[in-house]
């Protein structure tokens, strides 16, 4: 077996793309992401509300204890009585792993909504891996945005 030495040239990016080693994925639009959403993902946040949710997650990420992510952590915190805003990913498979969480949120009086993509939730947190559920707690630093998002989430129609 022989090692092949790769020489870097000025047009390295073009040669890599041309050879097919790297695939460039164009960002999907909001409507394209809605295609992969589950049937139970209601109420779905609109495009503007989803952007506000992502912005809120970015601000909450600066304070580690004010953002809970992941299915297990969110379940535990909801059971222990933490309050805030829940944001769920709509493209989760299998659905059975998280289909009980909206009912728990309704019981506890916590506003919640679905966003189209779990990858976008992960990107808003600043990590490469997607997340299924987020619980954002209130903090003085982003209180205005938190109140605005909470008001809009409360106004969404919750399916019966």
Curated annotation (Swiss-Prot):
Any one cellular-component term (Gene Ontology): sno(s)RNA-containing ribonucleoprotein complex
Single Gene Ontology BP annotation: germarium-derived cystoblast division
SUPFAM superfamilies: L30e-like
Keyword Nuclease: no
Primary location group: nucleus
Transmembrane found in the keyword field: no
Name of the gene: NHP2
InterPro entries per UniProt: eL8/uL1-like (IPR050257), Ribosomal_eL30-like_sf (IPR029064), Ribosomal_eL8/eL30/eS12/Gad45 (IPR004038), Ribosomal_eL8/Nhp2 (IPR018492)
Subunit structure comment from the entry: Component of the small nucleolar ribonucleoprotein particle containing H/ACA-type snoRNAs (H/ACA snoRNPs).
Family to which this protein belongs: Belongs to the eukaryotic ribosomal protein eL8 family.
Location(s) in or outside the cell: Nucleus, Nucleolus
Keywords on record: Nucleus, Ribonucleoprotein, Ribosome biogenesis, RNA-binding, rRNA processing
The protein's name: H/ACA ribonucleoprotein complex subunit 2-like protein
Main function: Required for ribosome biogenesis. Part of a complex which catalyzes pseudouridylation of rRNA. This involves the isomerization of uridine such that the ribose is subsequently attached to C5, instead of the normal N1. Pseudouridine ('psi') residues may serve to stabilize the conformation of rRNAs.
Sample GO molecular function, one term: RNA binding
Cited Gene3D superfamilies: 3.30.1330.30
A Pfam family assignment: Ribosomal_L7Ae
């Amino acid at each position: 077996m022989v090692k092949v030495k790769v020489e870097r040239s000025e047009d390295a990016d073009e040669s890599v793309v041309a050879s097919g080693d790297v695939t460039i994925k164009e960002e999907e639009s909001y409507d394209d992401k809605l295609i992969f959403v589950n049937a139970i993902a209601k109420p779905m946040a609109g495009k503007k509300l989803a952007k506000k949710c992502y912005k809120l997650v970015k601000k909450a990420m600066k304070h580690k204890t004010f953002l809970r992510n992941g299915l297990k952590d969110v379940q535990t915190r909801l059971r222990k009585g933490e309050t805030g805003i829940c944001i769920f990913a709509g493209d989760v498979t299998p659905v059975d792993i998280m289909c009980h969480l909206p009912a728990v949120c309704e019981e506890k009086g916590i506003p919640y909504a679905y966003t189209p993509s779990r990858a976008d939730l992960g990107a808003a947190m600043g990590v490469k891996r997607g997340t299924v559920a987020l619980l954002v707690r209130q903090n003085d630093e982003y209180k205005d945005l938190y109140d605005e998002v909470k008001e809009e989430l409360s106004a969404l129609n919750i399916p019966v």
